[in-house]
Every structure is written in structure tokens, then in C-alpha cells.
Amino acid sequence: MVTYCTLCHTGLVWDPMVNGTRLHFRLAGINNGNALIRDEETSSVWQQSTGEAIFGPLKGRHLNVVRSNELTFALWRKEQPQGDVLKPDAPYISEYEKKGWETYVEKTVVVVDTTKSGIGPHQLMLGVTVAGKNKAYPIDAILAARVVQDQVAGAPVLLVVGSDGASIRVFDAAELTFTKGEGDALMQDADTGSGWNFQGCAVDGKLAGRCLREIDAYKDYWFDWMNHHPETAVFKG
């Protein structure tokens, strides 16, 4: 099930199977600026950005996340030339095509107080969770650096910007040290000199053919990420 919350810029894919039953969902409302979805089978209400049922018979249950990436269409088409594209419903196509809606959303008032954090509520972040520990990475900082090596829960992580200059993936750095590369090799490890692509796979050098493990990550406005991950760390690099 593909979900997207316009108010918090959060796109997530969830497995709709719960207790062996496929649930069917529809939009139910908004809670603290994040979308709510309701399943037709039990009328339980679920938080879009966490996949948790917060009301109804299934309260406390969590949907399992399905790994996904938010990519530009050009980059996705390059990676998946035979991939299918979901067409918008004809009656609503004019709504999909509206320009400038993000600027409008960024001006909306939020009910989550972020003043103590010193970060604006609509600062776009990339949220990463490792071993139950959370960390938020300002998107602008990642796009500027192109390759960022850091730690979450003591584990080495690698954030990489795609050739389109907009898409981001996160990998388990596997205790290698990476720098920016060139061409298809967007990054190079200092340990062996191998070049690595945006899929996290070595395309040349001693480690050619080896692939890093991808880590789930998703974009979220700061107010929403902080609200659902109050103990989060924030990248300061």
C-alpha cells in the first residue's frame, strides 16, 4: 500500500497484511498534521507516518514497512526501464498537476511546537532508524555534501545523492570509508579504491560486484519527524 501525506511530505509503503488478512485502507483524516488512514475491515485508524493503529480493535498494532525510494522520474526510469507507471484517476488529474502546492503547505500553521529545537517546523529531513535509534538529516545539507558518512546507534551509515542531484539513498557503510566519485561511480572507498554506484554496488576495483545493504529512510518535515520520534538525534555536519 503506497501512502503519501501532503502536509508532512511523507511517502511510505506499507504491507497491508495483518494477522493473515489483507486490509483495505482509505484516508480518514489528519492528526497533528499527519494523515490518518482507516481500514475497512475493522475500522481501526492508523497513523500514516508510523504505520501504527491508534484507535479501534487493532490499536497498538503496526504495519510492516516495505522499503521504497523517493526518486526523480528520470532516475527511476534509468534504473527501471521496463517499470510500470501508475496513471492518476482521470477525475482527479487536475489536482495532481497543481503547481506550487509545496510552497502553500510550507506556510500552513502546525500544532507541534518545534521552537525549543531551534529548527523550523517545515525543515525537510531524511529520517533514518537503526536498531531503534532515530536520526534526522537536513536534506539541504545532504544534497550539498553529496556523500555523507555518519553513525546511527553506533553503526556506520552512508548517505548518497544520486546523479540527478535530488534523490538520496542510505546504506550500511560496512566499516568502509567513502568519498565522492565520478560518473557511474558516485562514490569511492578509500580502503580499496573501488567505485560504487547509486544502488550501493561496487562497479570496479577489488570489491567489484559487492553490494552494500540498504537502510530504510524517508523524507519528513521536521515537525512530524520530531513528533513521532521525540528522542531523535539531528545531524550537525
What label would you give each PLM region?
Residues 1-237:
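Mid-to-C-terminal functional-domain signal that highlights helix-capping/loop sites
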